[in-house]
Amino acid sequence: MSFDIAKYPTLALVDSTQELRLLPKESLPKLCDELRRYLLDSVSRSSGHFASGLGTVELTVALHYVYNTPFDQLIWDVGHQAYPHKILTGRRDKIGTIRQKGGLHPFPWRGESEYDVLSVGHSSTSISAGIGIAVAAEKEGKNRRTVCVIGDGAITAGMAFEAMNHAGDIRPDMLVVLNDNEMSISENVGALNNHLAQLLSGKLYSSLREGGKKVFSGVPPIKELLKRTEEHIKGMVVPGTLFEELGFNYIGPVDGHDVLGLITTLKNMRDLKGPQFLHIMTKKGRGYEPAEKDPITFHAVPKFDPSSGCLPKSSGGLPSYSKIFGDWLCETAAKDNKLMAITPAMREGSGMVEFSRKFPDRYFDVAIAEQHAVTFAAGLAIGGYKPIVAIYSTFLQRAYDQVLHDVAIQKLPVLFAIDRAGIVGADGQTHQGAFDLSYLRCIPEMVIMTPSDENECRQMLYTGYHYNDGPSAVRYPRGNAVGVELTPLEKLPIGKGIVKRRGEKLAILNFGTLMPDAAKVAESLNATLVDMRFVKPLDEALILEMAASHEALVTVEENAIMGGAGSGVNEVLMAHRKPVPVLNIGLPDFFIPQGTQEEMRAELGLGAAGMEAKIKAWLA
């Protein structure tokens, strides 16, 4: 879409942060209003993360107004809230391409702009990186400042607290801004508290604070009295004791939608030494009533009509794999009160809403704490319960040691329901489920299953749930199932594949939901088609049978080729001295960028036409 100067006259003046800083302060509330309307106009046309950005408009304007970005370094955690940042940093006219193939990246991305200091997508990394950046800036000696913006969800993760604990120890000059967008604004946010925040961040208070500590440093009782008095004054209106104990100078909470007040507080804090912590209160979805009322639904949106206030309803076609999992979960829980389900802040995405309502005492959302989720599941298993960890492939990476040390070594029966396996689409490099087969396949005692359709998915979940000799995993993709009939649940024989079609010369060994395309290729080439079903243990007898009765083999998977299921097939053949030619089809050795699932599969040759072309070229 073209930028409408008449509709956004103040925003039209801002092509860069340098131009932003030339605006008089009095014009900034109008800029915020236009920026918020432009964000609504753009995202409703293009789709994308929405409610978080609406809540950070004033903060974004204030930060870029006070700090000399990009010389001063601004780090956004996760990046859902960074759309206004992109608009103000030279990407205004391209914001309509965000999350699209070849368009703006969905998150801050170092390769896209000098303003994007840290590439992000996963949560709770900003403070750790910010400490390193701040230490480097101190050694550089050019008075470069470092600011990290982190949300109230992301700050609950252990990594954020590890970083803050370290910052309190080495005391770098840096600012952490906590964007607290809980549903209700705290009672502490108001004129008195905003005034106190400006007072406590001001030079007079800061110099008195430090000077008093120096003067009375040799008099322990008075030093302690001063500390307690300061804490008492702050404690009357602020909840910052935890952050003070970690070594930060805590200011807040303040109104995150008062752009002029934020500018005053940030200017006061900019030159303070040591780690600083500014707590701001915002409203997710600010300025668009439907998003304010339902920020979860409006967190990420498809294209929609803003005037209607409603998102388009799904077509009501085939269920998603997440829905298949959620239905199976409820069905199984109704029969077995030992079932416990765990998610790290992915209730909606993992299809667990209905389960959480029907079985609240057996549902555990542990927040953004993947490591804890896995070891918590281990504890439940030790206690005689049957835990299921529902987690995205890309986030399971964050709990790898816990899978190894706390579950697999102890042979605990934990079922991992791995959603978003393979290509996920618009979220790009940081969210592709490209590696789970590779990083799980090497773990002893692990059973790994790859369903080819929703019925197999249910049977495999059932099989894994009833497997008691160690951990098991079922991986399934983002998107809709294929529409096969659902049959009664029964346990599958562990490590056994099935031949779906008999052909000649060539055998295609398929792992997972690329099966419909693999079937088309097998039909076209008159190839044998095998649904391998298990990545671990592999059906070695079936692999050797295919090698003995065919001239060449092809493996198909939506996982990195390196270390994936196809690599396992190669290992079996080499171990048995069967030098049969094998073509491994899967994800190549680079991070897959954004684009729709269909676009990326076509580009990578994972559709029927692409697979057939690869096979023909290889056989030629």
From Swiss-Prot:
Binds 1 Mg(2+) ion per subunit. Binds 1 thiamine pyrophosphate per subunit. Belongs to the transketolase family. DXPS subfamily. This is 1-deoxy-D-xylulose-5-phosphate synthase. It catalyses: D-glyceraldehyde 3-phosphate + pyruvate + H(+) = 1-deoxy-D-xylulose 5-phosphate + CO2. The keyword Chaperone does not apply. Catalyzes the acyloin condensation reaction between C atoms 2 and 3 of pyruvate and glyceraldehyde 3-phosphate to yield 1-deoxy-D-xylulose-5-phosphate (DXP). It comes from Escherichia coli (strain 55989 / EAEC). It comes from the Bacteria. Homodimer. SMART domains: Transket_pyr. InterPro entries: Dxylulose-5-P_synthase (IPR005477), THDP-binding (IPR029061), Transketo_C/PFOR_II (IPR009014), Transketolase-like_Pyr-bd (IPR005475), Transketolase_BS (IPR020826), Transketolase_C (IPR033248), Transketolase_CS (IPR049557). Mg(2+) binds at residues 152, 181. Keywords: Isoprene biosynthesis, Magnesium, Metal-binding, Thiamine biosynthesis, Thiamine pyrophosphate, Transferase. Its cofactor is Mg(2+); thiamine diphosphate. The keyword Metal-binding applies. One of its GO terms (cellular component) is cytosol. Thiamine diphosphate binds at residues 80, 121-123, 153-154, 181, 288, 370. Its EC number is 2.2.1.7.
